[in-house]
Regions:
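Bacterial N-terminal signal peptides that target proteins for export
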Residues: 1-11
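Hydrophobic helical h-region of N-terminal Sec-dependent signal peptides
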Residues: 12-17
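N-terminal signal peptide c-region/cleavage motif recognized by signal peptidases
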Residues: 20-23
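N-terminal, motif-rich segments that launch catalysis or mediate targeting to/interaction with membranes
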Residues: 25-135, 142, 147-263
C-alpha cells in the first residue's frame, strides 16, 4: 500500500504540464482520451457526481494524459515504473519477477484500495483518480506487458511505412493514428456499440485477469512481428480490431472500477 501522506503531499502538479506531449509511456494522447471518454459515458450518476466534485467539475477525460507528463517530473518520477509490467519470454504472468518500484497491476490495485479506504482527503482522492484513469488505459496497451529484455519493445527495432521505429512506439500511438483518422469522440461513437450484456461480460474479472489478457496479446504481437519487420498497411489491418477491442475494454473496465468505488 502506498504511503498516504505522500499522496497528500504530492497531490498537485502545475497546470503547465498539461500542455506537454509525452508519448514514451502509453497509448498516446488519443488512446487515453478514448479510454476515459468511454468510461465517462458508462459512469453511474452517483459516481459521475462524486468524481466531478473531487476533480473540481472536470471529467476524467480532462486528466486522461496527466500522468504521462507527471511521471517525467522530480515530484512524480517514482511513478515511472507504474505504467507497465515487464514479463520475459521464459516467465509466466504469475511468476514474473516483481519490480521493487512497482508496476501497473500493483499501482492500479493500490489506487483502488486508497480510494476505498476512506483515509484520503479531497486532494488525495484527486491524485489517486488521476493515476487510476491513466493506468487502466496503460494496462490495456499490449506493449505495456512486454518483455523485460527489450524494455517492452523499446529495443525491438522494426520499419513502419519505411521509417525506423521500435515496437513499443508503434503500439503506443502510431497504429491508432494509422487505423482511423478519427477524433477521440468519433472513436467512442464507432467502437462503443455493444449492448448491456456484452459490456457487463467485458467488465467482469480482476485487475490481474485483465493484465494477463493483455499479456497474451503481447505474446502474439512478438510472434508476428520479428525484429527488422517491414510493416505497412497489412499490419495496420491485421491489428486494428485488437486496438479497438483493447480501447473498449479499458474504458468499460475503468467505468466498472469507478462505479464500484463510488457506489
Amino acid at each position: 500500500m502506498m504511503n498516504l501522506s505522500k499522496l497528500l503531499k504530492l497531490a498537485c502538479l502545475g497546470a503547465g504540464l498539461l500542455a506537454a506531449t509525452v508519448n514514451g509511456y502509453s497509448w498516446g494522447q488519443k488512446g487515453h482520451d478514448v479510454t476515459c471518454a468511454i468510461a465517462q459515458k458508462h459512469l453511474t450518476k452517483k459516481a459521475k457526481k462524486q468524481i466531478s466534485e473531487i476533480l473540481d467539475g472536470k471529467s476524467i477525460v480532462y486528466w486522461a494524459n496527466w500522468m504521462d507528463n507527471a511521471s517525467h517530473t522530480p515530484e512524480f518520477r517514482h511513478t515511472s515504473t507504474w505504467h507497465y509490467k515487464n514479463i520475459d519470454a521464459d516467465e509466466t504472468f504469475e511468476n514474473a519477477a516483481l519490480n521493487e518500484h512497482g508496476d501497473v497491476i500493483r499501482a492500479i490495485e493500490e489506487q483502488i484500495a486508497a480510494l476505498k479506504s476512506g483515509k484520503l482527503d479531497k486532494e488525495g482522492k484527486a491524485l489517486a483518480l488521476k493515476f487510476l484513469v491513466h493506468l487502466t488505459g496503460d494496462m490495456h496497451c499490449p506493449m505495456h506487458m512486454g518483455h523485460r529484455s527489450d524494455r517492452g519493445g523499446n529495443q525491438w527495432q522494426i520499419q513502419y511505412f519505411g521509417s525506423g521505429k521500435n515496437l513499443h512506439s508503434i503500439w503506443d500511438s502510431s497504429l491508432i493514428e494509422s487505423a482511423h483518422k478519427w477524433t477521440y469522440t468519433e472513436w467512442v461513437e464507432q467502437i462503443d456499440t455493444y449492448g448491456k450484456a456484452e459490456n457487463k461480460a467485458i467488465a467482469e474479472g480482476s485487475v490481474s485477469d485483465w493484465g494477463r489478457q493483455t499479456y497474451e496479446i503481447s505474446k502474439e504481437i512478438y510472434d508476428e512481428t520479428p525484429v527488422g519487420s517491414k510493416l505497412s498497411y497489412d499490419y495496420v489491418s491485421r491489428w486494428t480490431p485488437t486496438i479497438e477491442q483493447q480501447l473498449l475494454r479499458g474504458g468499460l473496465r475503468l467505468a466498472a472500477i469507478l462505479n464500484d468505488i463510488f457506489k
